[in-house]
C-alpha cells in the first residue's frame, strides 16, 4: 500500500500545473538551466525556460586567422592550372627560383635552402630484381658504391631487366675508403680492417648469378687483378669495367690492372683542375689522374679508357673546355657528365643545379672534340647508362669481328704468384 501511494504521488506531481509544483522542482529546473551554455537569463518558471531555450540560436564560432588565410588561399583550380590561371609552364629559371626557401631560425641564423629540382627526383627502389640483388649482396658480404655513395639511380640500375640497365657497382676491399673527398659519402678511415680473402670469389659468384655488366671500384691493384681473372673465368662474356683510384701515382699497379683482362679502365678526374684541391682529397691531383689514364692506355692500347666529371661545383666554361682538351690529349675514349648532389650537410654545398639543356650542350661539344662516347645528364654517374652496347661493339672491332668482349681473358699465370698472394 505504501508503494502504491508513492507511485500515485509521482504521477500527480508530473501532471500538476506549474503553480502547484513544489519549490524543490523549481530548484531542479533552475540548476539544469544553469548547466546549459545559453547566454539568456535563467527563469524560475520551467515553462518559460523551455520555450526560451528552444528558440535560442547558438552563436557562430569566432573566425580565426588560420581560417581566414585558408579561405583566401588558392582553390583547387589554382593547383590544377599551376596557380597562374592557365596551362603555361614555367621556364627552368623560374622553376629554379621557386625551389629556394628560407629556413626559419633565430635572428641572424636564417638559411636559404635549395630544394632538388624535379628532374633530379627518382622513384624509391622496390622491384623484385632490386630485392634479389640486395639479398645476394648481404649473403655474400659484398658492398656496392650504389649504396655507400647513395646513388640516385639504384632503382633503375638494379631494377632493370635488359643488359643496358642491369648494372651493379661492386666495391672491393670493404665499404671504407682511405681518402676523404669533400663530395663523397663513402665511409672513411685512415687504417681500414684486413681484406676479405673470399671477396674475389664471392664477387665472381655474384656476377655469374646476376649476369650484369659490372664496375669494380677499389684501391688495391692486386685485389683488382685477381677479381677480374675470376670473373672472366666464371663468365667470359661479361663486360668488366674497373673504376680505380690513382694508386698514389704508382703506374706499375695501373699497368697490372690494365693487363688483368678487363674491358674498360675507368678513373675519374671528378672536376676541373682549378677546383680539384677544394673538391677531392688533398692527395689527389688532376695531373696525376691524367697520368693514370695514359698509363692504362700504354699498357693495353685496345683498352677503352673512361673518366667522369661532376658539374655544379662552380666551374666555369673555360675551365671545362681546358679539362676536356687535356683529357682528349691523354687519349681518353669516354667521358661522362653528371650533377653533383650533396650527400649530407657535412659535405660541400651545391653551387648550381645545371639544367638538362646545358648537359646536352656539353655532350655535343665533347663529341665534336673526338670522344668515342659521351653520357651527359643530371642523373648520369660514371657507371650509369654509359653506353655498354656501344662500348662492346667498339671492343669487337678493335679485337676483330667474331671475338667476344671477354676474348682476351687473362689466366692466373699471367699475374705473378707472389703478387696475388700479398
Swiss-Prot record:
Pathway recorded for this protein: Protein modification; protein lipoylation via endogenous pathway; protein N(6)-(lipoyl)lysine from octanoyl-[acyl-carrier-protein]: step 2/2
UniProt keyword annotation of Transferase present: yes
One Pfam family linked to the record: LIAS_N
Biased composition (Polar residues): 37-48
Keywords from the named record: 4Fe-4S, Iron, Iron-sulfur, Metal-binding, Mitochondrion, S-adenosyl-L-methionine, Transferase, Transit peptide
Transit peptide: 1-34
UniProt superkingdom: Eukaryota
Reactions catalysed, as given in the entry: [[Fe-S] cluster scaffold protein carrying a second [4Fe-4S](2+) cluster] + N(6)-octanoyl-L-lysyl-[protein] + 2 oxidized [2Fe-2S]-[ferredoxin] + 2 S-adenosyl-L-methionine + 4 H(+) = [[Fe-S] cluster scaffold protein] + N(6)-[(R)-dihydrolipoyl]-L-lysyl-[protein] + 4 Fe(3+) + 2 hydrogen sulfide + 2 5'-deoxyadenosine + 2 L-methionine + 2 reduced [2Fe-2S]-[ferredoxin]
Binding site for [4Fe-4S] cluster 1: 146, 151, 157, 383
Similarity comment: family membership: Belongs to the radical SAM superfamily. Lipoyl synthase family.
Protein name as it appears in the record: Lipoyl synthase, mitochondrial
Gene source species: Talaromyces stipitatus (strain ATCC 10500 / CBS 375.48 / QM 6759 / NRRL 1006)
Amino acid at each position: 500500500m505504501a508503494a502504491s501511494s508513492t507511485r500515485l504521488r509521482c504521477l500527480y506531481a508530473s501532471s500538476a500545473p506549474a503553480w502547484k509544483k513544489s519549490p524543490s522542482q523549481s530548484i531542479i529546473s533552475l540548476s539544469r538551466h544553469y548547466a546549459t551554455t545559453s547566454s539568456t537569463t535563467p527563469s524560475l518558471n520551467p515553462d518559460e525556460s523551455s520555450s526560451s531555450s528552444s528558440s535560442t540560436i547558438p552563436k557562430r564560432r569566432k573566425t580565426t586567422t588560420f581560417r581566414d588565410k585558408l579561405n583566401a588561399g588558392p582553390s583547387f583550380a589554382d593547383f590544377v592550372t599551376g596557380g597562374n590561371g592557365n596551362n603555361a609552364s614555367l621556364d627552368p629559371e623560374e622553376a629554379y627560383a621557386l625551389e629556394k626557401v628560407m629556413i626559419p631560425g633565430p635572428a641572424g641564423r636564417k638559411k636559404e635552402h635549395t630544394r632538388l629540382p624535379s628532374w633530379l627526383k627518382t622513384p624509391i627502389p622496390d622491384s623484385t630484381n632490386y630485392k634479389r640483388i640486395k639479398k645476394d649482396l648481404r649473403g655474400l658480404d659484398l658492398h656496392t658504391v650504389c649504396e655507400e655513395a647513395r646513388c640516385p639511380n639504384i632503382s633503375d640500375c638494379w631494377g632493370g631487366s635488359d643488359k643496358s640497365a642491369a648494372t651493379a657497382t661492386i666495391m672491393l676491399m670493404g665499404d671504407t675508403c682511405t681518402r676523404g673527398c669533400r663530395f663523397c659519402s663513402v665511409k672513411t678511415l685512415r687504417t681500414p680492417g684486413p681484406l676479405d680473402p673470399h671477396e674475389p670469389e664471392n664477387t665472381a659468384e655474384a656476377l655469374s648469378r646476376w649476369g650484369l655488366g659490372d664496375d669494380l671500384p677499389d684501391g688495391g691493384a692486386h685485389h683488382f687483378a685477381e677479381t677480374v681473372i675470376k670473373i672472366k673465368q666464371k663468365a667470359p662474356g661479361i663486360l668488366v669495367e674497373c673504376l680505380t683510384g690513382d694508386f698514389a701515382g704508382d703506374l706499375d699497379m695501373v699497368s697490372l690492372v690494365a693487363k688483368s683482362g678487363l674491358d674498360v679502365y675507368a678513373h675519374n678526374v671528378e672536376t676541373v683542375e682549378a677546383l680539384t684541391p677544394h673538391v677531392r682529397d688533398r692527395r689527389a691531383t688532376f695531373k696525376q689522374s691524367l697520368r693514370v689514364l695514359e698509363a692504362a692506355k700504354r699498357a693495353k692500347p685496345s683498352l677503352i679508357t673512361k673518366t667522369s666529371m661532376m658539374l655544379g661545383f662552380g666551374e666555369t666554361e673555360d675551365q671545362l673546355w681546358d679539362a676536356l682538351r687535356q683529357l682528349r690529349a691523354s687519349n681518353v675514349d669516354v667521358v661522362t657528365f653528371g650533377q653533383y648532389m650533396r650527400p649530407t650537410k657535412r659535405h660541400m654545398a651545391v653551387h648550381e643545379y645545371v639544367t638538362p639543356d646545358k648537359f646536352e650542350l656539353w655532350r655535343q661539344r665533347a663529341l665534336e672534340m673526338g670522344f668515342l662516347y659521351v653520357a651527359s645528364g643530371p642523373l648520369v654517374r660514371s657507371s650509369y647508362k654509359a653506353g655498354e652496347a656501344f662500348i662492346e661493339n667498339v671492343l669487337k672491332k678493335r679485337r676483330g669481328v667474331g671475338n667476344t668482349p671477354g676474348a682476351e681473358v687473362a689466366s692466373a699465370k699471367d699475374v705473378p704468384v707472389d703478387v696475388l698472394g700479398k
